[in-house]
Each structure stands twice: as C-alpha cells, then as structure tokens.
C-alpha cells in the first residue's frame, strides 16, 4: 500500500471492498499512509472500524508544531496515538505479518521493518522531510519511505502468489499554493509518482482511485469521505475487470526477481 498522506484513508476503503469480494491478505507491505492503514488492519480491526479511532481528531491533535530546525512538526503525539489505540506494541505481535518501509536518512537506502516497536516504525515511514522531524531508531535517523519506494510491491513479491497493489497517489492536484509546505509536498509527489511506476508493473491487481487529488493533507475531518472514494473506486475496478476480462488478475511472472 502506497503513501498518500490524508488519502491513506482510501486504503481502508479499498481494503473493505476487497474483503467483501473475498480477497484477504496473508501479508501486508506498506509505506507512510499505507503503513498506517496496514497496521490497524493487521492489529485485528475491520477497515471501516478504523475510522472510529480518528473521529473527532484534527491534524494538529496528532502533531506538535516546533521551532523549525529539522522539521516543522514533531510526531510525538502521533506515536502516543498509535500506542493508545493499537493492541500490539511490536510488529511481531500483530495478527498479520506487516512490513513497513522507511528511508534510512543516514545511509541513503531503504529500510524494511518487520519487527520492533510499531509506533516508532510507522512514524518513521510517515516522516516526510521538512514537514516532520526525522525519527531516530537505534542511532539511525529515518524519514518517509516513499522517497525511495512509494509503492512497496517488491518487498513481498517473492513470497506471494498474488499481489494486490493499492496506489492512492496516482494524480496530483493541478493547482497548488506558493508556500514552503505546498512546494515541498508537490516536489515530493513527483518523486513518489516516479518511483511507483516500476512497482505498479509487478502487481497482479492494481487499484488506483483517480478521484483523490482535491483533498488537502490537513482535512482529517473528511476521513470517511476519502474512505468511500477508495471503497467505491475499488468496487468499480473489480466489477469492470470481471466484465471486460472475466478475471481481476493479470498474468505476471517474476521468476528472476
């Protein structure tokens, strides 16, 4: 599951639709918003029930504005939120295997977490540079995994017979504000889109809701609306594939991966 900030709620809607079509994951790979959606599901929650955890919250409830040094916001409140609402505290305690992708800022490489403290690793994967201060884990600083791999299909491709990729960041809004945060986010989105292209081709089923570009990253109050966008788009995609091709799966071979 891809990154996508507030659009990550569409992951939950897509997952809900997939479950209703009897498509259930045995393992989840997520980055940033995808890691957040994935961890709540892997902790035993139905996708539509996850919305309840965020009800009544605003962006500022989960972040802390700081004097800019390495980021405009800290994620301490976000980590506390995760610790308060997840039953599992370590990745290895989850009901379903979850691999979280982050970017190792010190060494310029990908990091794939499958064990350890959940809150720290989800925060690291969601930590978009400039906007958020890097997260330190075991003496290494980490930032948003989407910088190097925004759609982490390769992470689990070898161990899966079928891979469903959900990409909630296929398009960007045509208009943007000329300020430091807006310009930074838009610039990152170019990177996210670019490194997603090769990963898209490795999936057996690709879900891309193309109706999410109008949402602001601070509109947490629209979580349910974004959820429904993902839900409806996924149902439409599955039904169209069945009608046009007779199957939702495409033929993919990765013998040499």
What function would you assign to each model-found segment?
Residues 1-31, 39-257:
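Patatin-like phospholipase
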